[in-house]
């Protein structure tokens, strides 16, 4: 996508030459637009192509790709400009307006032609060959705050996707993205900083060399265990799940049976066992010692073909346990696992603490009759929402658009029974993201119907219907959502957390860090 914006920042009075000089310092600082942009994608962030001052107006031409879109970029300029000139020059910002905004989406000609006649509220749609142009005119600060631009883009992209949608959209009886419940915090939120930035500066976390990995120091580890215990006590134990220890190194054959390899093969870490040839490894070691670098090409020769993945969903071993077994749905099974990390390769999408490649979850998996499976899913979601209310955490629950077992798949050639709603996703509000109301997904409650039952040949001994379901409570994300709303001051935290944490441990002090 390409974004081309003509807009203006309107001040409370004419901008003096002295104030203009200070504003230019902000305009020339591109770091404002790079926050949250993945490494290597900086070229897709907002750029100021030209600017000029006209009395009270700062007139801007801006462009961008997908990251820090131009309409987000112009809004981001407000705060640093006010910090520069507000007090020193007694000038305020009265409004931010967009005179004209052209958003271009590239697609196949055949798909573009199918959008002919489509009406998008509050904007104009122009179709030109392989290009879809969404054109806004005279958009004010109020419309920006209502996210009409992002909604219009999502609307058009959804219309495109309908022509080639994931199986999720075909299966789901309620439109993905529909909010089914929400809760507004009773207290006033007074913390608006990025929890990742502050956690780093305080020394609660430190970036690990691997992409999307972090070292969690004692204060953060203490908070992890506090939330883990709370989720077990307030959610998992109330539904009487039994704890198991699930393997985290999953054979490729298991992933094949799950059909995970069809939907998201690019989202996993693949594991290659080494060849048992010590003399060949000695050559590798010798070369490394002499060259003082790791000879990757030689190492590749010493590895067998990929045979495993690191668990990307955490529930994989559950279905393997019942592979080609006869079960009794009158004796349903409810297991949970909290024994280790889950791994997903996010590539360039890994950012901050809320989207990582290595994360901790408490994973519940169950099997029984369709009615039982649906009731358990509803209970896991209910108790998660109850916990958020007890902690006075603002949240909403929506119909998910990416149940892990359907993600990326366009069709299923088997006679699979799917639930009306495969996935609900509960999100905690992130108040530091001001351009739009965003949340971090903390609980994912899924029903698979007969998807895994068919894949693993699981049958009821009376030939009755067997379904499965799973709910993941993402510890890493629960903590990010909590810190985003409460901040890092122990005294500001609710008693429910303090009673679990008791006393916060100290951070090891070094000369150079934190």
From Swiss-Prot:
One Pfam family linked to the record: tRNA_bind_4
Required co-factors: Zn(2+)
Cell location: Cytoplasm
Residues holding Zn(2+): 315, 363, 470
Binding site for L-serine: 313, 344, 361-363
EC number: 6.1.1.11
Record-linked CDD domains: Gly_His_Pro_Ser_Thr_tRS_core
SUPFAM superfamilies listed in its UniProt record: Class II aaRS and biotin synthetases
Main localization category: cytoplasm
Catalytic activity: tRNA(Ser) + L-serine + ATP = L-seryl-tRNA(Ser) + AMP + diphosphate + H(+); tRNA(Sec) + L-serine + ATP = L-seryl-tRNA(Sec) + AMP + diphosphate + H(+)
Cofactor binding note: Binds 1 Zn(2+) ion per subunit. This ion is coordinated with 2 cysteines, 1 glutamate and a water molecule that dissociates from the zinc ion to allow the coordination of the amino group of the serine substrate, which is essential for catalysis.
GO cellular component: cytoplasm
Family annotation (InterPro entries): aa-tRNA-synt_IIb (IPR002314), aa-tRNA-synth_II/BPL/LPL (IPR045864), Ser-tRNA-ligase_2_arc (IPR004503), SerS_tRNA-bd (IPR041293)
Pathway(s) per entry: Aminoacyl-tRNA biosynthesis; selenocysteinyl-tRNA(Sec) biosynthesis; L-seryl-tRNA(Sec) from L-serine and tRNA(Sec): step 1/1
Binding site for ATP: 344-346, 355-356, 477
Top class in the EC scheme: ligase
GO molecular function: ATP binding; serine-tRNA ligase activity; zinc ion binding
Family: Belongs to the class-II aminoacyl-tRNA synthetase family. Type-2 seryl-tRNA synthetase subfamily.
Purpose: Catalyzes the attachment of serine to tRNA(Ser). Is also able to aminoacylate tRNA(Sec) with serine, to form the misacylated tRNA L-seryl-tRNA(Sec), which will be further converted into selenocysteinyl-tRNA(Sec).
Complex formation: Homodimer.
Comment text on domains: Consists of two distinct domains, a catalytic core and a N-terminal extension that is presumably involved in tRNA binding.
Protein name: Type-2 serine--tRNA ligase
Source organism of this protein record: Methanococcus vannielii (strain ATCC 35089 / DSM 1224 / JCM 13029 / OCM 148 / SB)
């Amino acid at each position: 996508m390409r974004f081309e914006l003509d807009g203006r920042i309107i001040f409370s009075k004419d901008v003096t030459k002295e104030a203009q000089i200070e504003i230019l310092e902000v305009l020339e600082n591109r770091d404002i637009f790079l926050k949250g942009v993945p490494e290597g994608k900086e070229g897709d962030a907002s750029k100021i192509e030209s600017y000029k001052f006209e009395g009270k107006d700062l007139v801007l031409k801006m462009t961008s790709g997908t990251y820090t879109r131009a309409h987000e970029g112009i809004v981001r300029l407000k705060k640093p400009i006010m910090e520069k000139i507000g007090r020193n020059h007694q000038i305020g910002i009265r409004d931010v307006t967009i005179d004209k905004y052209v958003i271009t989406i590239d697609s196949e000609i055949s798909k573009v032609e199918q959008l002919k006649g489509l009406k998008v509220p509050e904007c104009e749609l122009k179709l030109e060959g392989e290009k879809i142009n969404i054109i806004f005119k005279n958009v004010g600060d109020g419309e920006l705050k209502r996210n009409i631009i992002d909604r219009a883009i999502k609307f058009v992209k959804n219309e495109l996707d309908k022509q080639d949608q994931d199986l999720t959209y075909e299966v789901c009886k309620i439109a993905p993205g529909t909010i089914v419940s929400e809760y507004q915090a009773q207290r006033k939120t007074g913390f608006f900083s990025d929890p990742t930035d502050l956690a780093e500066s305080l020394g609660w976390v430190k970036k690990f060399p691997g992409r999307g990995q972090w070292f969690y120091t004692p204060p953060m580890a203490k908070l992890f265990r506090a939330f883990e215990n709370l989720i077990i006590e307030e959610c998992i134990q109330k539904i009487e799940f039994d704890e198991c220890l699930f393997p985290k190194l999953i054979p490729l054959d298991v992933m094949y049976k799950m059909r995970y390899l069809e939907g998201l093969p690019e989202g996993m870490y693949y594991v290659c066992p080494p060849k048992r040839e010590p003399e060949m490894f000695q050559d590798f070691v010798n070369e490394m010692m002499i060259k003082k670098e790791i000879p990757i090409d030689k190492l590749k020769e010493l590895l067998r073909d990929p045979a495993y993945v690191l668990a990307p969903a955490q529930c994989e071993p559950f279905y393997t346990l019942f592979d080609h077994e006869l079960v009794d749905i009158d004796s349903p099974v409810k297991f949970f696992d909290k024994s280790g990390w889950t791994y997903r390769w996010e590539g360039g999408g890994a950012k901050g603490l809320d989207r990582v490649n290595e994360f901790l979850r408490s994973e519940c998996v169950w099997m029984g009759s369709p009615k039982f499976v649906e009731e358990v899913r509803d209970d896991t979601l209910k108790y998660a929402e109850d916990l958020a209310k007890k902690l006075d955490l603002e949240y909403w629950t929506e119909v998910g658009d990416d149940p892990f077992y359907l993600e990326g798949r366009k069709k299923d050639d088997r006679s699979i029974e799917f639930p009306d709603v495969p996935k609900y996703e509960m999100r905690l509000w992130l108040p530091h993201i001001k351009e739009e109301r965003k949340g971090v997904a903390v609980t994912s409650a899924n029903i698979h119907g007969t998807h895994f039952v068919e894949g693993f040949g699981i049958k009821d001994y009376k030939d009755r219907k067997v379904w499965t379901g799973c709910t993941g409570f993402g510890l890493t994300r629960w903590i990010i959502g909590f810190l985003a709303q409460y901040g890092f001051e122990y005294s500001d935290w609710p008693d429910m957390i303090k009673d679990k944490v008791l006393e916060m441990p100290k951070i090891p002090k070094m000369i150079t860090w934190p």
